[in-house]
Design a protein with these regions (language model features):
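P-loop NTPase catalytic core
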Residues: 150-151, 157-433
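Active-site phosphate-binding and catalytic loops of NTP-dependent enzymes
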Residues: 7, 51-54, 89-93, 108-114, ...
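Phosphate-interacting basic helix/loop segments used at nucleotide- and nucleic-acid interfaces
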Residues: 2-5, 9, 85, 143-148, ...
Length: 433
């Protein structure tokens, strides 16, 4: 108790720096006077309404401080006072977060009451992690999804991307993973989601079983860009807290594209030049800083699953291309497979786990290679077969593939309420071939 009092005294504000608003353009607020550093939290006092708006320092322009608000700016006007709190965004961490839903400021929004106690944890996306402190990834993380565990095996501490257009089963796959994965705890960030989809994801995709060992961090599409930008950092900070307690954490983020869009809004508002498709240079600095926070560590691990929305199913658009180069593999969801009622709609040929060869047995590698070989032969000749131009017996390898494809497709499909162990997957692959 005495030590806590000392910490409170050390954190107490002894000097208060104030300024006033000079200009507002779009979502950017310019203030003069006072002192501040990038990342400081400021309070804007709305004199007429008697309220306060929290904002973060995002840059400087001449002698003015540039601020971006965490809430609606309605009622703010030139001349309003701005006070620098001298603090950074922090939230309380503890076991009480399990099964809860919070916003991007760490405040509970599920109606289950406020948090009590816990450890105050600063949320920042500027941690440098010494690469020499990262042990090699040698253990599997079982996802309970056949197509992933058998053909795209993922290790504890690996970072994988799910690349998908809209409406191909991305949220459903995330729910399946959250329910079936052999992780100690799930941390799920929903960035820029439609408001109605949050509860729908909890009840339909995640379910009570998945929710019990999950923590949801939510910033909906109608909230300010600062909240949508902070949401992934808050979720990653929570994952880091539990990792330091020795947990193997699954961190899921939906989606990195909306995080990049929020950063684009902020960058354009403070005067950054647009580069590729309107994205600003800061995005390409923020993405690796965020993604490198996941991984395998001495005490625990953070296995990252990040979704990327591909515009017009173009997997080579700027954000998708950048993220693919940072992550340790990618899972591509195919609209063609989804349209043929093949779920999860994972395109095995277009997907890869870069660490699979290091974490599975030689037998598993041989079986997976044979399945890929059969699928590749079939795909290469699919048009020939579909128009009836192929004559059986002409190509023995194609004949073999045609005889196996129905079984392979059946093996790679899975119901949302089904779960399979790694051993069951291996046995099924042996029988397939």
């Amino acid at each position: 108790m005495f030590q806590e009092m000392i910490r409170q005294i050390q954190r107490a504000e002894t000097i208060s720096y104030t300024g006033k608003i000079e200009n507002i353009v779009g979502m950017s607020i310019e203030a003069s006077g006072g002192r501040a550093a990038v990342g400081d939290i400021c309070q804007i006092y709305n004199g007429d309404a008697g309220g306060q708006v929290m904002a973060e320092v995002v840059g400087f322009k001449n002698d003015h401080i540039l601020l971006m608000p965490y809430s609606d700016m309605s009622g703010i006007s030139a001349g309003n006072f701005v006070r620098n709190t001298g603090r950074r965004l922090s939230l309380r961490m503890g076991p009480f977060l399990k099964g809860r839903v919070i916003n991007a400021l760490g405040q509970p929004i599920d109606g289950k009451g406020p948090f009590q106690g816990g450890t105050l944890f600063r949320v920042e996306n500027n941690h440098y992690i010494n690469p020499m402190t990262r042990p090699p990834i040698r253990e599997r993380m079982e996802f309970g999804v056949k197509a992933i565990d058998s053909m795209l095996t993922i290790g504890k501490g690996q970072r994988i991307g799910i690349f998908a257009g809209s409406g191909v089963g991305k949220s459903t796959l995330m729910g399946m993973i959250a329910k079936n994965v052999k992780a100690d705890i799930n941390v799920i960030a929903l960035v820029g989601e439609r408001g109605r989809e949050v509860l729908e994801f909890m009840e339909k995709d995640l379910g009570p079983e998945g929710m019990r060992r999950s923590i949801l961090v939510v910033a909906t599409s109608d909230q300010p860009a600062m909240l949508r930008k902070q949401c992934p950092s808050v979720a990653t900070g929570i994952a880091e807290f539990f990792r330091d307690q020795g947990y193997d954490v699954l961190l899921m983020m939906d989606s990195l594209t909306r995080f990049a869009m929020a950063q684009r809004e902020i960058g354009l508002a403070v005067g950054e030049p647009p580069v590729s498709r309107g994205y600003t240079p800061s995005i390409y600095a923020e993405l690796p800083k965020l993604l490198e926070r996941s991984g395998n560590f001495q005490k625990g691990s953070i296995t990252g699953v990040y979704t990327v929305l591909v515009e017009g199913d173009d997997t080579n658009e700027p954000i998708a291309d950048t993220v693919r180069g940072i992550l340790d593999g990618h899972i591509v969801l195919s609209r063609r497979l989804a349209n043929s009622n093949h779920f999860p709609a994972i395109d095995i040929g277009a997907s890869i786990s870069r660490l699979m060869a290091d974490i599975v047995s030689d037998e598993h590698k041989r079986l997976a290679a044979r399945v890929r070989d059969v699928m590749g032969i079939y795909e290469k000749n699919a048009d020939l077969v579909s128009v009836g131009a192929y004559k059986a017996g002409t190509n023995p390898r194609l004949d073999y593939a045609l005889g196996k494809m129905d079984g392979i497709n059946q093996f790679l499909t899975q119901g949302v309420d089904e779960a399979f162990s790694y051993e069951e997957d291996l046995e099924a692959m042996r029988k397939l071939l």
